[in-house]
Swiss-Prot record:
It is a multi-pass membrane protein. The chain crosses the membrane at residues 4-24, 41-61, 158-178, 198-218. Binds 1 zinc ion per subunit. The lineage of its organism: Bacteria, Pseudomonadati, Pseudomonadota, Gammaproteobacteria, Pseudomonadales. GO terms for cellular component: plasma membrane. This is Protease HtpX. The active site is at 148. It is found in: Cell inner membrane. The gene is htpX. It comes from Pseudomonas entomophila (strain L48).
Length: 295
């Protein structure tokens, strides 16, 4: 909770600074001179409220959504040796990472994958695919679990939601400024918001949304490297590299995880170049190389 409060306070300060900066550079005067009566401070607050609302709601219901969309079955009483080993391993790794034991689940999928989610590092969910549990060696599965526990310990789910809230805020803010400018200055509309405002705002949100996604995915790729480091610390560098190499050997298999959960899975990062800018995971080769350099 302290992480959320500090992050929200920081970003409210960013909103305030942005509003003051635009005023100092005469942006308000420029818009007013062209017939646009726009209170940038109020607009920023409005956009911040709605920008953060969606991402924070998604964060708070993330465990429920993950269970629903992936078909994850929570293990309450282990029925097999696989389930017993899984619970014991997650409990051990959680203790080493200094977090409370998360819920542990298995979702039905042949491909090897796993994810962690939850609004709080002490109220999380870690789930693995049936394929990972059945086809990978215990050391490989343990390394994958250590990676996911690393995400939880680092508070990545919370930070991702808050980063998304920030970019949502500024996408909405600048899209509405552009919409007002096009409507009032270019189309000379003086009576409320004309059709040009709505069209320009939607187009601006689409374009700015793509640019914002590049920022969010850049951060997502950075957190994967950090989770790999945490996994190496908990399970051993050799085991973490071995798990990533095994995942690399299975690239190309269809992934049945919903799009909303792919950013929180361990497997991903097939594309390079411009397409790679919108990938939530770095290429596995880059992650393996980073661990080798770490030693």
């Amino acid at each position: 909770m302290m992480r959320i409060l500090l992050f929200v306070a920081t970003n409210l300060a960013v909103v305030l600074v942005a509003s003051i900066t635009l005023s100092l550079f005469g942006f308000n005067g420029f818009m007013a001179a062209n017939g646009v009566d726009l209170n940038l401070g109020q607009l920023l607050v409005f956009c911040a409220v709605f920008g953060f609302a969606g991402s924070l709601v998604s964060l708070f219901i993330s465990k429920w959504m993950a269970k629903m969309t992936t078909g994850t079955q929570i293990i309450t009483q282990p029925r097999t040796r696989h389930e017993q080993w899984l619970l014991q391993t997650v409990e051990e790794l959680s203790r080493e990472a200094g977090i409370k034991m998360p819920e542990v689940g298995i979702f039905p999928a042949y491909e090897a994958n796993a994810f962690a989610t939850g609004w709080n590092r002490n109220d999380a969910l870690v789930a693995v695919s049936q394929g990972l549990l059945e086809r990978f060696s215990p050391d490989e599965v343990r390394a994958v679990l250590a990676h996911e526990i690393g995400h939880v310990a680092n508070g990545d789910m919370v930070t991702m939601a808050l980063v998304q809230g920030v970019v949502n805020t500024f996408v909405m803010f600048f899209a509405r400024i552009i919409g007002n400018f096009v409507d009032r200055v270019i189309f000379k509309n003086e009576e409320g918001h004309g059709i040009a405002y709505f069209v320009a705002t939607i187009v601006a949100e689409l374009v700015l949304g793509i640019l914002a996604s590049i920022i969010v995915m850049w951060y997502s790729r950075r957190r994967e490297f950090r989770a790999d480091e945490a996994g190496a610390h908990l399970a051993g560098t050799g085991a973490m590299i071995g798990a990533l190499q095994r995942l690399r050997s299975e690239q190309g298999l269809p992934v049945h995880m919903p799009d909303t959960m792919k950013a929180f899975g361990i497997n991903g990062g097939l594309k390079h170049g411009l397409a790679g800018l919108l990938m939530s995971h770095p290429p596995l080769e880059d992650r393996i190389d980073a661990l080798r350099r770490r030693g």
